[in-house]
Amino acid sequence: MSTNISNKNSMSTSGSNNNTNNNNNSGCSSSNSSQRHNSIVELLSTPPQLPHQHHFNKSRQNSNLNESMSDSGESGLRRVDSYSSNDSISILSINSAHNHTDVGDVIINNELTASTTASTVGSGNSNQLTQTTSQCISSTHSQKWQHIQLTQLIEQNKLITVQGSISIEEAFNTLMKYHLTSLPVESYPGDMNCFTFDYNDLNSYLLLVLNKITVNNREITQDCQNGKPVPVGEIIKLTPKNPFYKLPETENLSTVLGILGSGVHRVAITNTEMTKIKGILSQRRLIKYLWDNARSFPSLEPLFNSSLQELQIGVLNTHSKPTSKQSRVISIQGEEPLINALYKIHEERISSIAVVDHQNNLIGNISVTDVKYVTRTSQYPLLHNTCRHFISVILNTRGLEMGKDSFPIFHVYPTSSLARTLAKLVATKSHRLWIVQPPEPSDINTGNTSNPASSHSPMMTAVDHSPSQTPNVSPTNLFEKEYRTGKLIGVISLTDILSVLARKQTDNKQVDPLSARRQRGSVSM
C-alpha cells in the first residue's frame, strides 16, 4: 500500500462502530462477560428501566404519573407474537447520547437518561435533580411524539466540522480522535451546503489508492496512488451522496421521520432562520433515542411486540424480487479476499455486508467502518487474506482494546420481535441486521453441533485462527440458541424500521425506504 492514512494510535483509540465500548443505555452491560451475555439473551427485548417510583412521590401529581409509568414498566415490552402489525401506536419520544457520534460532538437531548441514571445510583441527590426528571417525563407525556419539535432533541456542544482543504489523513484522524463516524466538510466557515465525510469516503479513497476504482480526475488519481496529500473536499465527491437535507429546529419529528425513513442517513438541524447548523440528527441516533425511551410510551408496545414477519419488513421471499418495503440482501463468500468485500460495499453503496459460507450460512459481518483496520501499510496483507480471517482479526483486536472477548450478534429471525431487533441494532451500533432461517426445534433441543462452522456465529469461534475447529467451551442451551445462526434469507435496516414508523404513525404514508438509494448516482469528476 502506497500511503499511510492512520495515526499510530488509531488501532488503540478506536472502538468498532458495530460493537460498543459502553452499552449501558442499550441494556447490554459490559462490566463482565457473564453479565453481558445474560443481558443480551434474557433482557434484549426489554427497554431500559424508568426511574424507580420512590423518586417521584414528592407530590400527588408525581405519584399519579409514576403509577401509570410503573404499570407500563411492569408489562415491559414483552414479546407477544399475537399482536398484529395493524395494531395502533400513537406516541413516542426520543432521547440518547452515543459513544460513537454520527456527526460532530452533538448531543441529542440527554436530560431524561442522565437524570434517570443519577437518581437511580445516587439517592442523596438534590431535589432539583428529581424535579428535572419529573418535568422531563411530564413534558414528554403531554404531547404526541409526532409534534415534538427538533429543538427539544438537540443540544449544541462543540459541533465538530473540518475544512475541505485539509487532507484525507487529517479528516480520518479527526474521526478517530472524537470517536465519530462522519464529519461535516465546509468549503468555508459557516457553509450551509456542506457534504459529510464518512467511512464510505475513506473506503473509496483506499480503493482509489489500490487502483481498484477509477475517477475522471487524473490528478487526484495520481496523487492518491503516489501517496501525496489529497484534500478531503475532493474525496467526498467520489462517493454518491444524497442532497444535504436541512430542517429548522421548529420542525417536528413527523417531518424528519419522513426523510430518514426514505433512506437518508442524517439531517442537519438549523436555527429558525436556517442560517446556522445547530446539530445533526442521524438514523442511528433516532433509533437509539426511540429505544431508550420506549417504556415511557406504552402505545408503542403492539408495534414493538410484532414480529418482522408480521410487519412485512426485512424478510425476503427467495423466489421473488425485493419490493419497495424490503432491502436487498448483499453477501460475500467467507473465502473471498477482503478487498473484494470492500469493493462490493463501495459498488453497492451499503454500510455493511454479510459473510456467508458455501451453503449460504451466515458466518459474520463486515462493516464499512472496519476499513480503519486496514489503513496502515503494515495491515496491507489483510486486504488479500480471506473475509473469514479478517473477522477473526477484528474480534481479537476488539478483545485487546476492550480487555475482554467480544461477541456481537448481527442476526435475527423472521419471528424476532421488532423490540429485539431494535435492541440488537442499538447494542451493536449497526445500521442493519441479517435475517437467518430459525434453527430446527430438534437442533435446539438436542444441541446438535455437527457443523459448528455454520451453525454457530463466528463471533463465538473466529477468535481461533482455525475456523474449522470446534470451540472448546460449550455454551448453555440458552446462549447456544441466541448465538446460533443459519441460512441468510434477509436483512433489516434502520431505514426499514424508520419507514414503517413513518407509514404507520405519520402522514408520510408513501415513504419508500429505497428512494434515497435510487437518488445516489455516480458522480463524474
UniProtKB/Swiss-Prot annotation:
Record Pfam families: CBS
Q: Where is the composition biased (Polar residues)?
A: 59-73, 443-458, 466-475
Q: Which GO terms describe its biological process?
A: cellular response to glucose starvation; regulation of mitotic metaphase/anaphase transition; septum digestion after cytokinesis
Drop me one GO molecular function for this one.
Answer: protein serine/threonine phosphatase inhibitor activity
SUPFAM superfamilies from the UniProt entry: CBS-domain pair
A single GO cellular-component term on record? nucleus
Record's keyword terms, sorted:
CBS domain, Cytoplasm, Nucleus, Repeat
What are the residue boundaries of the CBS domain, all occurrences included?
154-215, 238-296, 323-382, 439-508
Functional summary from the UniProt entry: Involved in DNA replication and cell separation.
Family assignment? Belongs to the SDS23 family.
What is the protein name for this chain? Answer: Protein SDS23
Q: Which organism is it from?
A: Vanderwaltozyma polyspora (strain ATCC 22028 / DSM 70294 / BCRC 21397 / CBS 2163 / NBRC 10782 / NRRL Y-8283 / UCD 57-17) (Kluyveromyces polysporus)
The coding gene here is: SDS23
